Amino acid sequence: MLWVPYILLIFIGLFCNNSKIYDFCVIVFMGLVAWLNTGAADYSVVYLPTYLNPFGVYDMDLGWSWLCALGARVGLYYNGFACILTVVSMILYREFGRKIGTNTSFMLALFLVFPGLMSLVQFRQFVASAVGCVGLAHLWTSKMKSRYVVFGTLMVLAILIHRSAVVLLFALLPSFLAASGKRGRVVVLLALMAIGCILFVNWRTLSVQLFGEMRASVYLGVSGGSNGVSVLGGLRNAILLLLMAVLPYLCNRYMARIKGTLGKELFEWEVGRAPLGILFINVVLLVLVPVVFLTNDFMRFERHGLTMALGLFAMMPSLKKRAPILSCKALYVTVCLVFAYFYVANTFDSVYVPLLNPQSIPPFFI
């Protein structure tokens, strides 16, 4: 039932430039899908039971329990709660794009391709990512002294909703490295190597602690919820991590060339704090390469990086001096399609089909 508007919105978004009407339609569509969702993975197993008993679920992030309790207190049924929270999260994500100066309409079109619908399945991470993204955008673009308080508050909230949002803090690295000198950069490099080693040694325990018992592997092509992965699956994960590090680098490099600052150090490229922050978070995620040969779970960190990178990608076609390849919208649509193919194809019937073919109209209020 919703396939036609879904495909039309993606297609129309390719030709829109910061269209408020288009952005509004995407936000409403995502809210509608969230409201009508009664059959997608995790709905009846995780999210509905958690909503009905928010403080009775073991190891649930406290911020999510608070939100669920608030929704129930004001009389919302879970689907109504999910609809409102989706709309708010989409507004925050659009605000992230607006603040960093990207084409919000193209960014939302890319988001619809991937990870839009998957975000409604792994819902907490989506909400946390939207909150964290707008917090970073505010820090990067605001000149008010209170920006640090706003950023800190939003980041704490994001981490309380889903603890994987802590990875968004790596987007602050450019500012830190620019001010720390060579010694500080060595310390950061050693710290990242240590993080990689800790992940590799404790991957099984950390995957459960970070993502819960209902792990990402259920959706990423591993049968029965096992968090193992084949050699080819690990190679696929590593290639996608590398792609998401290289492509933002090339985008930043081209923008620096336009500015005439390419000959300077990376931190002096004058491309803006947001593009550099997006680049660094995706580069840092390369520490996951060893562990993604053991489990798919940690690719969910890349979801945060990809969600932010869509804002950078949507800038490229709007540059005054376009690049032959990097300013081509088809390139970024293809990247999203590749992610969608690898991470949704095997679970198409538990993600896209139930979300876009709702079987009933659930109540909005209790």
Q: Where in the sequence are the language-model features?
A:
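Transmembrane-helix signature of polytopic, membrane-embedded enzymes
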Residues: 21-22, 94-113
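Membrane-interface alpha helices of multi-pass inner-membrane proteins
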Residues: 115-116, 149-174, 286
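Membrane-interface transmembrane helices that cradle and orient dolichyl/undecaprenyl
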Residues: 132-148
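Transmembrane signal-anchor helices characteristic of membrane glycosylation enzymes that use polyprenol
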Residues: 1-5, 9-40, 197-198, 335-343
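Loop-to-helix entry region of an early transmembrane alpha helix in multi-pass inner-membrane enzymes
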Residues: 74-88
